[in-house]
Amino acid sequence: MKKLMAQKPNLQIQNGMTVIDKGKKRTLDECFQMFQIIYQVTTRTEDILLITKDVIKEFADDGVKYLELRSTPREENSTGMTKRMYVETVLEGIKQCQEEGLDIDVRLLIAINRRDGPAVAKQTVKLAEEFLLSSDGVVVGLDLSGDPTVTKKAGLKLALHLCEIPNQEEETKILLGLPPDRIGHGTFLNSTAAGSEEIVSLVQQNHIPVEFCMTSNIKSQTVPSCDKHHFGYWYSLGHPAVLCTDDKGVFATDLSQEYELVAKTFNLTRSQMWDLSYESINYIFASNAVKSKLREQWCKLKPALFD
């Protein structure tokens, strides 16, 4: 972000560098300011390429071996960037990181913002279908959808953000009927958090993995404190769980921090944390061949961690 800000001094974004420099000390309002800063400084394909590569490198430096990036295609009339160009540029960034020898396997979920409406959602699904066929397995799914059934029919994996706010029971039941391949956040799914036992049963019956983003939930104030986080509920049930960062740069976190937070909050042992990481391979959207390769990597790394 600092690189892009330096390249565009004419933008004069109020308090931009101050917000960026605050890092982990950002307030909720400052996290939302970060979203606005990102949109203002990423208007060209070269901006998208830079930020894609930087994010991948940061994850690689953190020891992450498999990454599913999520990004919403954007068009920018002022620069001529189209949604197709946007996706192509993200894919180019992934390709360049691979060519540079980074020890990380990166895939892409093309995201849809529900607020954009069904027409835009359909366009994005169509774009995702095309890249599913042409990206040599890099595009593996869709994050959210105006009409999620279209996604499933196209062979794309589907991650749905569900129950991020309370009192969404009817909508949640409908969407769980698809069912999605993973649930994002799911903050209010369970009955102890304004959800319902029926919804919990649906999630369990379909063995739908839940993605947990503790730092994001705390900073966005959907969860009051770490010890109240819904990870504890689902983990106690032995339900499939995946620890994630949500928007890494915005919420100033990394995957190591998310694992550390969960371990400290719920008093999990090193062995339990290992199992959590290893089992998450089962829930990625890449092929079985990729899963097998990752399991081999994990098994090679394990002895050094438990000596």
Functional labels for PLM-detected ranges:
Residues 1-156, 164-182, 186-307:
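Metal-cofactor-binding active-site regions of metalloenzymes
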